[in-house]
Amino acid sequence: MTNNTQDPAKVYYDDVQVGDTIPKLVKPPVSHLQLVRYAGASGDFNPLHTDPKFGELIGTGGIIAHGMLIMGFVGQMLSDYFGPTVLRKFDVRFKGMTRIDDVITCTGTITEKHEVDNEGRITGKVRATDQNGDVKITGTFVVALPRRS
């Protein structure tokens, strides 16, 4: 697992440029236990996420991870880099199923800088892929960052 957590106080609007990349976050392989725990935490006990026989029965080839878990991985990447209090908007599209043992890598790129109500805002694109490069999530985000002066 890569942990590129940066002190959020060190990420300033003035220092971020369009085209900059966010330090990637690589998660350990998704496990069955992790999905059962996530089901308990989220209240989503759909057997598609916890029962291998059910997944085979309905044709998904086994268990698939909760989409919101993978979205949470992307959110972790954003909060690790920018800090937990600056996120203003976060939208994703689910593009593919995540399976047991998939290694998810989250990446992001800055696409725009602008001001809203005297806040320096950064817009960017994010994605989550597995070890084969298959896209699981694409999305966008907006954060409000402090200025140096």
Report each predicted region and the residues it spans.
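Residue-level signal for alpha-helical context at structural boundaries
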Residues: 52-56, 92, 144
